[in-house]
Amino acid sequence: MKLKLELMQMTKKNMADVVTCIGVAAILSVIVFTIPNEIPIGEMAYQKLWLGRMAVVFVVCSLLSLCLNRKQYLSFPAIVTWVLIALGGIEAAWGMRQIYGLAVSNHSLYALTGSFYNPGPYSGYLAMIFPLCLHEWLNLKERTERTWVEQGKYYMALGVMLLILCVLPAGMSRSAWMAAAVSGIWVYGIHASWATWLKEAGQKYKKTMITGLVIGGLVLIMIGYVLFQLKAASANGRLLMWKISCLAIAESPVVGHGADGFVSAYGRAQEEYFANGEYSETEELVAGSPEYAFNEYLQVAVEYGIPFLFVVLLVIAFCFWRGITEKQIGICGGVISVLVFALSSYPMQIPGFAMTFYFLLAACVIGRSKVALLFFILMIALLGAYYWKNNQYKACKEWYRSKMLYNIGAYQAAKEGYEKL
């Protein structure tokens, strides 16, 4: 009787894991959905629409999973990890096909974009998956006797990691390279217990350690200089964007300029800056009208103010601390990767990427807590409802159709289409 009860509990646990996996995979896989030709490439309305729909799938699956698995340990962090590794493998394979000309990219200027419309966010997504693969591979490598399931996971993590390492250099995203390097070194350092080794070495070989730190610092400066010169115009453009963003923050540091107010605030600040005449020739050459700050921290401060940015950073820090205490090393590595990438790119402006980051933070916090999972389910339900209700996909489709009619000279039909909007 006891054995039968245990078997029933195991069956329910496995069923709950499968259902949860379906829900997580449904919402996170939106990032690999191909944007239809009826709206412009890079428009986020289609992705938001499907995030709203898949949020319903995730909520239903998660609640059903909780009903099936009331007493057993939650597998949410592990499920998020392996779903992301699988999606990383799909994206990396997609990129390899584009490199060899077997698949078309989503941008006329770049051969490599994956399912994204630009190689920058695509590379950042792969950089986020890299520490997850590294952690799982190192973790499974330490086991001398692996089951066939663990053996499959071992080769899957290794294969995806190697694919990512093959594709990342071709993306030419310095931000993604730094994100992958920092998060990868952190994950490997945790596994190799570098903190303990450095503490002991610092006590025994103090002078040698100081010399090593100085040399390491010089090497980092040289690497930074090389990366800067690799695409100097792009780097100078971002420096100007950050400078103008800081000026925009100074105009309204407490409450910001409102949601989606970055473009207008940036435009005004840049106009005033150039009107003063205190600009360099390089800044004049690289100035433009960006949609994003290419620094998520500055973007949040511009739109919502410095206090809100401080609260966001506190929430992220709490989630990261919980992840460390729960020993979710790979997931914490993914969080580090996104945080580093966000210093010089715009991952949170892509809804699917942002949703993935929310799941990483949730996987850090949830651990064994069903209450935390319920709270996260509620958050995703509200976010999904917002995406679905306030979606502009139909309007974007009609606008794009009218624009095409205008371009071919069908002005009356285009006029009628624009009037509907």
Predicted regions and their residues:
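Membrane-interface segments at or immediately adjacent to transmembrane helices
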Residues: 241-251, 390-421
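Interfacial juxtamembrane loops and adjacent helix segments
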Residues: 106-109, 259-302
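Interfacial loop-to-helix junctions that mark the boundaries of transmembrane helices
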Residues: 42-52, 204-207
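Alpha-helical transmembrane segments of multi-pass inner-membrane proteins
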Residues: 11-14, 18-37, 51-68, 76-108, ...
